[in-house]
Amino acid sequence: MAIASTLASTQNPFLCLRQPPSPGNRSVVFRRCQDPCGRRWISRSIRACQPSDKVSGQFPFDFMYSSMLIPSSCGEWNRIHLGGDGGISASAQRLYFGKELLSFASDNFLPLALVSGVGLGFANPTLGCLADKYSFTKISTCGIFIISGLTLRTEAIGAAVKGWPLGLFGLISILLLTPSFSRLIMLVQLQPRELVTGLGIFCCMPTTLSSGVALTHLAGGNAALALAVTVASNLLGILTIPFWVSRYIAGGVGVSFPTDQLFRSLIVTLLIPLIIGKVIRESFKGFANFVDNNRKLFSKINAICLSLVPWIQVSRSRSLLLSVQPKVFLAAVGIGILLHLSLLAFNAVSIRILSGLTGGSKSSKENSTAVLLVSSQKTLPVMVAVVEQLGGAFGETGLLVLPCVAAHLNQIMIDSVLVNLWLRRGKDTSTKVKTA
């Protein structure tokens, strides 16, 4: 009867209203539907909501405690229940928890992507081996540096030049200081011996080709400085790797290294993609604006490209990993974690001292973040290339690489957690400033 009387109204046609079960300050929804052309329904809603602090439950938004009739295109009426009797509808609960889940995934996208890559490599190594066959690792590395070129602002290059003292320290730390940690690693007695030898070689490597830059970008550090240190250390590292491996790993015995091949590979996978990305940015200003307005999207694409590396490496090493005793492998993993934490502590203290001498401005903080991340990581692809070219001079190639795969994954995960902590601390600080 109520609906019929409402439909009969000439002043307010198709006004559908159901009051809450009991009087009070509840949400009321008015929906007016007009049919000016006889074919298409046009709806307008007017909503009066109860204050959120009076709604039972812990949901930070208001709910409708009424239902409404909505006409369909075929002339039928559909009733939608939006809650009632002061309760919260199941759809609203699902919406809230869905938003919370999406927010968590967005805030922790990189570690989730890395864990997913490792899990996929263990669950189905066939896909990872197929991706390795078609050089997806090189493709993902090229993709990361193309994105780095796309997001590289010209003014950031000037900031990188201004941060040359920290950048120079980063190069010295990567190429001259941190390789000496391999001497301590070689003192560890662990069988098979290749596990320790592999970590020693890993310690002599330059910084990661992609993850340091990607993490610097996520942390809001000086990505241009991170790029400069990454490219320079990997190109110069071709000259320093033979010396350190011969001195600390081979006991002074000379070993042959594929210097020319490594140099060409790094030029193709690092420098050329970076230049291509920068040229595209400078050539198409509209696309540059699109990149600047969607930096979070490109950061997620960076994270996906980065997760391909552990996925492929775990897929390749799965059978070998299962053949090693868990106790021995966990010990090697622990050594890798301890190595990365030691590098972080050493570089953090050194950077703090150097930053105190050069000044503690905001730009100095961004430079410190970049140098700390890139100077504390070691690259896996270059290590794999070096070991493969040595032809088994230090033992089984798979066993040499296996602990380094774990160390590579652990350093990325540790640093991604560290970056997330920095981001949350920055959000809390900005919130307190706004509140004050």
Swiss-Prot record:
Pfam families reported in the protein's UniProt record: SBF_like
Location(s), subcellular: Membrane; Plastid, Chloroplast envelope
InterPro entries, sorted: Na+/solute_symporter_sf (IPR038770), Put_Na-Bile_cotransptr (IPR016833)
Membrane topology per record: Multi-pass membrane protein
UniProt keywords, alphabetically: Chloroplast, Membrane, Plastid, Transit peptide, Transmembrane, Transmembrane helix, Transport
Function description: May function as sodium-coupled metabolite transporter across the chloroplast envelope.
Record's protein name: Probable sodium/metabolite cotransporter BASS4, chloroplastic
